[in-house]
Amino acid sequence: MTDFLIAFGSQTGQAETIAKSLKEKAELIGLTPRLHALDENEKKFNLNEEKLCAIVVSSTGDGDAPDNCARFVRRINRNSLENEYLKNLDYVLLGLGDSNYSSYQTIPRKIDKQLTALGANRLFDRAEADDQVGLELEVEPWIEKFFATLASRFDISADKMNAITESSNLKLNQVKTEEEKKALLQKRIEDEESDDEGRGRVIGIDMLIPEHYDYPEISLLKGSQTLSNDENLRVPIAPQPFIVSSVSNRKLPEDTKLEWQNLCKMPGVVTKPFEVLVVSAEFVTDPFSKKIKTKRMITVDFGDHAAELQYEPGDAIYFCVPNPALEVNFILKRCGVLDIADQQCELSINPKTEKINAQIPGHVHKITTLRHMFTTCLDIRRAPGRPLIRVLAESTSDPNEKRRLLELCSAQGMKDFTDFVRTPGLSLADMLFAFPNVKPPVDRLIELLPRLIPRPYSMSSYENRKARLIYSEMEFPATDGRRHSRKGLATDWLNSLRIGDKVQVLGKEPARFRLPPLGMTKNSAGKLPLLMVGPGTGVSVFLSFLHFLRKLKQDSPSDFVDVPRVLFFGCRDSSVDAIYMSELEMFVSEGILTDLIICESEQKGERVQDGLRKYLDKVLPFLTASTESKIFICGDAKGMSKDVWQCFSDIVASDQGIPDLEAKKKLMDLKKSDQYIEDVWG
């Protein structure tokens, strides 16, 4: 028997990508793994009948299970299951997460604990990969342990194991003097400038042009002397090629309808794509202020789709955000296909491929255009992973570039990869600017670029037909290896929208962060005490809560009870970035909000955590109350989620005279009972 199970729970696709990579590597050494989402348990597999399972899973939202894993988590936690239900199962588990969130690794830990409780045997320690420091730092050692386990379990020879790793003896040209080092770097710069002036520009087509950047001595372009001199780099085998694109000499017929990403299913999406109309687009802060991030507001009209969506306060919608044309043009030009990018392109499986069970990705059309694929289907902004860098190394005519790219995807170069690629968030374009002689085959990019994921935005209004969203502009300067200043992918696109534009959106599955909470009637929401914490644009979702309560009070006064509804709103300076202050003050004057507490970090040195400590009398009842109250936290996760969590823990510990660990357990009880609910983002 050479088969075993690989199961994943993935919201954004990272866990699924790792799981697929495990499957491909296992097949290279002669095994026959089966790959399934965890929610396919009791449908396409039965965990209690498996002998070996590798699980790759993440947490999402407020410590929630990914949408293709939530059912699995519920099923393995049934009280009816016996303690030895999984006694025949050996398993390994890799958890993915982001330590900026207070709910870090919640689901991987929960699954691990429950599998053990049901009698399963974990073969080695669970790994917890942290996106804040680089997933690879934990993922790669875990994969090595897993394949060592497979080698032992299935008696796989050393020769076969060599099929998934290789050593590279390619060395940098021996550069001994400072003058020679400078000459080498100067050649890189000249190659790059030549690329800008020649290959990088096409008459009549706008093209992304890099900004000048002086790379430090140790950087993306050159590693340490130790790494540069290592003659035995352990680099992964390049992924097997399997796609062939055939471009005809004619355009795609005008009546061809290319549905968004081939209508490929995505976890958390509950509708097909549909068009909405942009009815307003405006600034909500001064766009010329240098003190704050610019914030904007977009309103869309759902039209006839309003009844289908039936959104509630706290719900979000996905926007189908495309890649910028300048970047798409540059990448297609570097691949040598820009001049045929708008002609009909047909994808097929290479009949000579050695890849087992090769399939065209479901999110791309088999008949399409290269421009359409690279604009709407493939993520060119996400930092390239090591498999893609491995392919880039094979796509350059410069041996020095090849050596450095091999270093970046090698086991020895993992820290360099994290420091110079993953952490600064380099894009594919940044990598191509840095290595001007890399000309990747377009088919390899189609195979290896991840799916372009739509961007979710919570709605800040409560109307049947229209939805308002508020967002901060994200800025990324040309530093740390990024070769062009840019805004966030969604920011740039949202900024371009004008009244009358039509855009595609998708309905998002309701989460726990909503009013009324799941399982509660609309009328009962008017009796619910609320503590809301919203720094920055985090306050926007609470506007939808308050508009809903205002309508409830107008339509059904008897259901609107005088209970505490407290909002802590964090901003830098209320005179410049306290967005929708007049709206919030209206809610106070009408009795919708009982308390509006403004925390100004720049003017008064007060963050929302300081406000919570200052107004203990308003906060404590929510930390000791029954299930009839709710705490909602919304905002940027960069430290805020953990800091607010610690603040509440400090308050509980001080009030009850208990240790911090015990206070955190009490807070965790609030989370488990859905009294403490977060909606935070990175």
Curated annotation (Swiss-Prot):
GO MF annotation: an example: flavin adenine dinucleotide binding
Binding site for NADP(+): K293, R607, V608, Q609, D643
Gene3D superfamilies registered for this protein in UniProt: 3.40.50.360, NADPH-cytochrome p450 Reductase, Chain A, domain 3, Nucleotide-binding domain of ferredoxin-NADP reductase (FNR) module, Translation factors
Domain FAD-binding FR-type: 271-516
Cofactor(s) needed for function: FAD; FMN
Chain coiled-coil ranges: none
UniProt keywords, alphabetically: Amino-acid biosynthesis, FAD, Flavoprotein, FMN, Methionine biosynthesis, NADP, Oxidoreductase, S-adenosyl-L-methionine
CDD domains: methionine_synthase_red
Pfam families found in the cross-reference section: FAD_binding_1, Flavodoxin_1, NAD_binding_1
EC number of this enzyme: 1.16.1.8
Enzyme class: oxidoreductase
Function in brief: Involved in the reductive regeneration of cob(I)alamin cofactor required for the maintenance of methionine synthase in a functional state.
PANTHER family in UniProt: METHIONINE SYNTHASE REDUCTASE, NITRIC OXIDE SYNTHASE-RELATED
Name of the protein in its database record: Methionine synthase reductase
Originating species: Caenorhabditis elegans
Gene name of this polypeptide: mtrr-1
